[in-house]
């Protein structure tokens, strides 16, 4: 019962203090409104007005001090509240909203808090200017890419980098809109590479891609740079060496042969054969372009200036086979 009575008494006391403070504040407000202008001849002495206002301010502050102490502050260490005089700023234009003054504890005004104490907006503006200058200093180049009919007309060919589309807008005088891309790792790896894609008005299969800045992210290390345009791209394929066909070689060999027939009329036995087989490794001439072995039929003295020596001991009908 005693606890309930104590609680009821504290509530009544708190309510009474709040009412007293509210009344004092209303009186002060009324006096400030009724205060005549300094130019009025019927104004009361300035000292009396100042003393009355000071008393009302002290009553308001004291009433709210006791109210705060009653709001469950009894268990915490005693806090000494220093009353701060309230400065009343007259409103020049009653129709406009006055600027909120600084609070008692020195916290910033509401508009300062909205923009981060006046520094966040300036920092954001400085960052924007810095990034704009940084983008203008990046290298810039353009390429034209033609889309093959098999791939359709959805966009330019992939340039092996990962891009993210962040905007598109219509260009004055152009039939097709312009698309804007930036590196996927802009936020994570601070890569400022961007590109713009514009479809040609004259040929819908041609896209003009404008790059600005090179990739500084991990893609630049693991991937190759963008392909050049078809006009600038050089054919780096290895062309096979042009070789002469075996039939042409044999025809050239037959037309350039020089046959020595010295000693054909000698009385030697034309049917005496040497120990070496007459057709030893003859197949190397027809299909293989490697080392040509010598045989009793003919010896190739020089591959580019062939001279054939006929063995006089070999039958004459085999000599004629060289020419046909």
Swiss-Prot record:
It holds the Pfam family WRKY. Disruption phenotype: Retarded leaf senescence, but no effects on pathogen resistance. Increased susceptibility to P.syringae associated with reduced PR1 induction; stronger symptoms in double mutants wrky46 wrky70 and wrky46 wrky53, and triple mutant wrky46 wrky70 wrky53. In these mutants, higher induction of PDF1.2 upon jasmonic acid (MeJA) treatment. The keyword DNA-binding applies. Residues 152-220 bind DNA. One of its GO terms (cellular component) is nucleus. Keywords: DNA-binding, Jasmonic acid signaling pathway, Nucleus, Plant defense, Transcription, Transcription regulation, Ubl conjugation. Induction: By salicylic acid (SA). Strong accumulation during leaf senescence. Down-regulated by jasmonate. Triggered by P.syringae. Ubiquitinated by UPL5. Ubiquitination leads to its subsequent degradation, thus controlling the timing of leaf senescence. Belongs to the WRKY group III family. This is Probable WRKY transcription factor 53. It comes from Arabidopsis thaliana (Mouse-ear cress). The lineage of its organism: Eukaryota, Viridiplantae, Streptophyta, Embryophyta, Tracheophyta. The gene is WRKY53.
